[in-house]
UniProtKB/Swiss-Prot annotation:
Protein name: Small ribosomal subunit protein uS4
InterPro entries, per the entry: Ribosomal_uS4, Ribosomal_uS4_bac-type, Ribosomal_uS4_N, S4_RNA-bd, S4_RNA-bd_sf
PANTHER family (alphabetical): 30S 40S RIBOSOMAL PROTEIN (PTHR11831), SMALL RIBOSOMAL SUBUNIT PROTEIN US4M (PTHR11831:SF4)
SMART domains attached to this UniProt entry: Ribosomal_S4 (SM01390), S4 (SM00363)
Role summary: One of the primary rRNA binding proteins, it binds directly to 16S rRNA where it nucleates assembly of the body of the 30S subunit. With S5 and S12 plays an important role in translational accuracy.
GO annotation (BP), single: ribosomal small subunit biogenesis
Assembly: Part of the 30S ribosomal subunit. Contacts protein S5. The interaction surface between S4 and S5 is involved in control of translational fidelity.
Originating organism: Frankia casuarinae (strain DSM 45818 / CECT 9043 / HFP020203 / CcI3)
Single GO MF annotation: rRNA binding
Alphabetically ordered keywords of this record: Ribonucleoprotein, Ribosomal protein, RNA-binding, rRNA-binding
Length: 209
């Protein structure tokens, strides 16, 4: 599957906000967007007034980059959200949050969603006792996500276990048992408990044209 291979920090600067693609570095003064809070390139400091279309497109790109999803798959998620009974923007974020790589990241078992994707692809993650190596696998209510027994002594997971509770907060819809490297999915999140800083209505407006 195709993936973006450019510099992560340039993506954050392009969107003029932190996308939290580099793990703990994003929370330090070394984060490039703290040093250079303007887009990369020769004309990055220039003042331009974005059109309505560009604002909508940038918001879609920002959301897709946060969750590490390329355009074709992102559009598929939007189409699915649009068929659901709830508000399309809310449903889109619920779908993105229910991805396995996101749940591994939210549970604190990886410093970034990219690292979580790698852990899943390498077969280090189980769902309900079975190995799942597809990052886009959709988690359901009452699922149990855990690090596979053979992987629990790998350095990233030792660190995750020993530093549990010291980093970002685990969302209320998940319960983490650090000693077992296990995540209990109590529910799927409502929009009001999703802290992703995106204006999903702009995405809906873009795709509705």
């Amino acid at each position: 599957m195709a993936r973006y291979t450019g510099a992560d920090c340039k993506r954050c600067r392009r969107e003029k906000t932190k996308l939290f693609l580099k793990g703990s570095k994003c929370d330090t003064p070394k984060c490039p967007i703290e040093i250079r809070p303007y887009p990369p390139g020769e004309h990055g400091r220039g003042r331009t007034k974005d059109s309505e279309y560009l604002l909508q497109k940038r918001e879609k790109q920002k959301c897709a980059r946060i969750y590490g999803v390329l355009e074709k798959q992102f559009r598929g998620y939007y189409d699915e959200a649009n068929r659901r009974a709830g508000k399309t923007g809310d449903e889109l974020l619920k779908i993105l949050e229910s991805r396995l790589d996101n749940v591994v990241y939210r549970g604190g078992f990886a410093p970034s969603r990219d690292a979580a994707r790698q852990a899943v692809r390498h077969g280090h993650v189980q769902v309900n006792g079975r190995k799942v190596d597809i990052p886009s696998y959709r988690i359901s209510e009452n699922d149990i996500v855990e690090i596979a027994p053979k992987a629990r002594e790998l350095t990233p997971f030792i660190v995750a276990r020993e530093t549990a509770g010291q980093g970002r907060a685990v969302p209320a819809w998940l319960e983490v048992i650090p000693s077992q490297l296990r995540i209990l999915v109590h529910s799927l999140p409502a929009r009001q408990v999703i802290d992703t800083q995106v204006q999903e209505q702009l995405i809906v407006e873009l795709y509705s044209k």
